[in-house]
Structures are given as structure tokens and as C-alpha cells.
């Protein structure tokens, strides 16, 4: 595994990690969750499992995330899609004969869903892990808490605030522009797996997820006829049991390989 930097058309950069095995059968673009980064534990599982199955991986840092070049770009949804597109262009240029797959966690799955539905792309299979299918609901609320009201006040005064999903993750700079992006990017309304090709999707979700309601995930899967694998005693991280992270990636490998 080594680190790589890919330049985008807008002049910004995508900081990545790359692992391509010999006799590679395809390359997975991995996209992390909100306030996570390419250093996340899920990427570590992918780096261990995918090459053993003959699959390569490029795991990216989304704009405004991580500690490297991607952090310098303000978080906006189009910028996130641009990052995926730039990595995909690199793969097609460097490995023109290999198929491309997508693996997204939480916010990353939300972004991949938007990408598949609004951009030309070459990949035809995507795996959604703990997908934030209702991502706008996490920020845009009718009755925000006192803490959320304080952050909204900061954004009104300064134009931004910092937010992280928990104390273990690096805070992300949230702007009014990102709020506007969320207002116009409802995945339940926008998602269309067939708009830019016959895309196939599978999902995995924890039944005890307190970040993204599993019933929302079920509703999304049923609406778009997507196979979904539920893990009975798992939360949003899908990492409560020692073997769950491997089991989730095994599902993705099987899906990509069939």
C-alpha cells in the first residue's frame, strides 16, 4: 500500500491510498464516512481483504477530510463527486482493461449514490455500508438541540462551524453552502441506478444503528429494489463483533465478483 495524490480539474487534490495486486481483476474506489478519512479502520479491512480476492483498491479522502491534501478543499457535494470522478479517470487511464467498483460507508455511500445518479461513470456495481440514505436529516432539523442551535448561530455569524460525528474523528468545516447542497440532494428523490447505465447495488446495515435508522435503510432498499443485508446486533460502525467488519467486506467481494 502506498499513498497517492491525484489532481482534480478544479486545481484541488485527492489524497488517496492505493493497493493493486498482481493479476488484478478490478479496482474498488472506497469512500469513507463523514469526518472520517483514509486512515479509517474500514479501509484497513479492505486493504487486507480485497487484494487477497484479486481486487485492487484506491481509498480516498473526501474534501475537507483527513490531514493531507484533500483537507484544503471546502466540503461541497459536487466537490465530493469530482473527487470520485478524478480517481475514476486515473484508473481508466492507468488500468484501462479493469472494471471499476464502488464501496461507500455512511456519508460516502450517500455521495456514491448521488454520483451514480448524476454523473457519467464507468463502474457498474456499488456496495453501500451503513448508507446515510437520509443524510440531509442529520443536519437540517425542525427542532434542533441547543448544541445544534449554537452551531447554526456560529454559521450565521462566521459563515461556518466545525462538526464531527464523535470525539474520535477530526472535525469538518461545515459551511452554508454545504447546507444548501443537502437541501437539494435528497437521495430518496434523486437516486436512479439506471440513468447512466445498468448499475447494481447491494447494502449492509446494522439493526441497532442509532445514526441512520435501519428502517430508513430498509425503505430505501425496498423503494429501489436493492438487496440489503442486516446485521442483527450491530450499530452504525458494523464493528461490534470482531468478525463483522470482515463479514461485511466478504459480502462486498462476493457481490463484486459475481
What are these regions (language model features)?
Residues 35-47, 215:
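The serine-hydrolase catalytic nucleophile loop
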Residues 104-112:
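Gly/Ala-rich beta-loop-alpha elbow adjacent to hydrolase catalytic centers
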Residues 43, 47-69:
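Conserved alpha/beta-hydrolase
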Residues 25-33:
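Short beta-strand element of the alpha/beta-hydrolase
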Residues 110, 122-219, 223, 227-230, ...:
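The alpha/beta-hydrolase serine catalytic core
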Residues 1-21:
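N-terminal cap/lid segment of alpha/beta-hydrolase-fold proteins
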Residues 65-95:
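Catalytic nucleophile-loop/oxyanion-hole region of alpha/beta-hydrolase
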Residues 102-104, 129:
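Short beta-strand immediately N-terminal to the catalytic nucleophile in serine-hydrolase-like folds
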